[in-house]
């Protein structure tokens, strides 16, 4: 029988008081004319290309295979024509761009999958089907955040059905019309691990699947990062070099359930289109890899220079060419003003319109106020100063200041002892936000994790 765990209450963290929160109701998005697979979405992946510019592809057709994890296939998110295989410096793979044929009904169907019983399906058959249709890449490992190898088995699997990122969609709203497919997907996940499937959700959230055998429902409450998989894993099943868990987003669980019903790839994705510069912040239904330029056309304030972000304002990627597409694991598009201008004598002003974690501005007198955040860092990089700000936003049992210092000096031995293997870029996004030294800890932790993995 399924089990229910008590609520884990997070006290440390920060809910960013940003304007432009989305209305929690869904609308159909525009018909997308171009989609892409982005190389940076898949850590450590080295592609063997199976298509080239000018080739015709159908939905679910393999477009490249990973040299580093043999057999793992990445498939086309739409039917159409490959218009470009973008490469950057030193021929680094950037993107495969596809012009969508919205009139096409062609799709790849995996034989023997449609109508399969998710409870009794053979693990080998399920794994083979997920790999062939391209859904294997929905899983990521902790530690390191990579797509798992086909032969691996996780100690447990975490389903993230809670989202505390700024401007995020409510998973309960997205799941309301697709509960059956979500439950089927959960049942299938229990076939992939001998351990538990942890269904992580907000306190009192109406998330289906808690009664599925092999699923443990876990509730989390508190400020961001209460909704991040790193927080859940830390509290429920901590990892190490010799212990790996997988995590997956709730919309990918829906896609797995749909795959078991039809044998086909479901690329529907509900995202939050929100932020201070969005005219009508709301949830829209689009597709995997959608061109963000098309999503925001006519939706944003163009009177100022904008920064458009695929993902959270805390940890998303800037949506400029050749990365102007929805990231594989992103459930939101955020739009803020580009903070590339200096404020004359800004340090002398009381700061009624400025937010501060340290409450040094006059805005501290209006704690419920929300702010039109920009991309400005409020200064240039400087020395790291331990003022206790990192500890305020780190809910894990980790010495934040000491760990961050180890990351800066690339002391990977100390970083491992201090818990770096439990973290990824998104787990340190708040540390970057509150850092008085203006350090970017996301890139630093990735550099350290790469070194640790390489050196064993």
Swiss-Prot record:
Highest taxon of the lineage: Bacteria
EC number: 7.2.1.1
InterPro entries reported for this sequence: NqrA, NQRA_2nd, NqrA_C_domain, NQRA_N
Protein name as it appears in the record: Na(+)-translocating NADH-quinone reductase subunit A
Keyword Ion transport: yes
Entry annotated with the keyword NAD: yes
Organism field: Rhodopirellula baltica (strain DSM 10527 / NCIMB 13988 / SH1)
Subunit structure: Composed of six subunits; NqrA, NqrB, NqrC, NqrD, NqrE and NqrF.
HAMAP family: NqrA (MF_00425)
NCBIfam families noted in UniProt: nqrA, PRK05352.1-2
Catalyzed reactions per annotation: a ubiquinone + n Na(+)(in) + NADH + H(+) = a ubiquinol + n Na(+)(out) + NAD(+)
Function recorded in the entry: NQR complex catalyzes the reduction of ubiquinone-1 to ubiquinol by two successive reactions, coupled with the transport of Na(+) ions from the cytoplasm to the periplasm. NqrA to NqrE are probably involved in the second step, the conversion of ubisemiquinone to ubiquinol.
GO biological process: sodium ion transport
UniProt enzyme class: translocase
GO terms, molecular function: oxidoreductase activity, acting on NAD(P)H, quinone or similar compound as acceptor
Record's keyword terms, sorted: Ion transport, NAD, Sodium, Sodium transport, Translocase, Transport, Ubiquinone
Gene name of the encoded protein: nqrA
UniProt record similarity statement: Belongs to the NqrA family.
């Amino acid at each position: 029988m399924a089990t229910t765990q008590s609520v884990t209450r997070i006290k440390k963290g920060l809910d960013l008081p940003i304007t432009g929160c989305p209305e929690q109701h869904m609308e159909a998005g525009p018909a997308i004319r171009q989609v892409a697979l982005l190389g940076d979405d898949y850590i450590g992946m080295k592609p063997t290309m199976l298509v080239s510019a000018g080739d015709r592809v159908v939905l679910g057709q393999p477009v490249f295979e990973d040299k580093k994890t043999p057999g793992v296939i990445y498939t086309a998110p739409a039917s159409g024509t490959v218009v470009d295989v973008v490469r950057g410096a030193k021929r680094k793979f950037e993107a495969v761009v596809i012009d969508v044929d919205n009139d096409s009904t062609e799709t790849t169907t995996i034989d023997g999958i449609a109508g399969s019983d998710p409870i009794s399906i053979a693990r080998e058959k399920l794994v083979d089907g997920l790999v062939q249709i391209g859904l294997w890449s929905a899983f990521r490992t902790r530690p390191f955040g990579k797509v798992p190898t086909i032969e691996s088995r996780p100690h447990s699997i975490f389903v993230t059905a809670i989202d505390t990122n700024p401007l995020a969609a409510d998973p309960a709203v997205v799941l309301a019309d697709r509960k059956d497919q979500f439950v089927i997907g959960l049942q299938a996940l229990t076939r992939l691990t001998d351990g538990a499937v942890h269904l992580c959700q907000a306190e009192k959230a109406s998330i289906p699947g808690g009664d599925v055998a092999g699923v443990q429902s876990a509730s989390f409450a508190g400020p961001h990062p209460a909704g991040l998989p790193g927080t859940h894993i830390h509290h429920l099943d901590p990892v190490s070099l010799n212990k790996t868990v997988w995590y997956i987003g709730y919309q990918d669980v829906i896609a797995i359930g749909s795959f078991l019903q039809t044998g086909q790839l479901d690329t529907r994705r509900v995202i939050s289109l929100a932020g201070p510069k969005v005219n009508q912040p709301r949830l829209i239904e689009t597709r995997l890899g959608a061109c963000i330029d098309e999503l925001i056309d006519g939706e944003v304030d163009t009177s100022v220079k904008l920064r458009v972000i695929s993902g959270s304002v805390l940890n998303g990627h800037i949506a400029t060419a050749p990365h102007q597409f929805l990231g594989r694991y992103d459930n939101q598009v955020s739009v803020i003003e580009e903070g590339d201008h200096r404020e004359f004598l800004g340090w002398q002003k009381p700061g009624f319109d400025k937010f501060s974690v340290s409450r040094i501005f006059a805005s501290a007198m209006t704690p419920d106020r929300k702010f039109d955040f920009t991309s400005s860092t409020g200064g240039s990089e400087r020395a790291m100063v331990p003022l206790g700000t990192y500890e305020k936003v780190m809910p894990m049992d980790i010495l934040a200041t000491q760990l961050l210092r180890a990351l800066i000096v690339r002391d990977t031995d100390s970083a491992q002892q201090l818990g770096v293997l439990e973290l990824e870029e998104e787990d340190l996004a708040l540390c970057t936000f509150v850092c008085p030294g203006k350090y970017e800890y996301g890139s630093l932790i990735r550099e350290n994790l790469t070194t640790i993995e390489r050196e064993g």
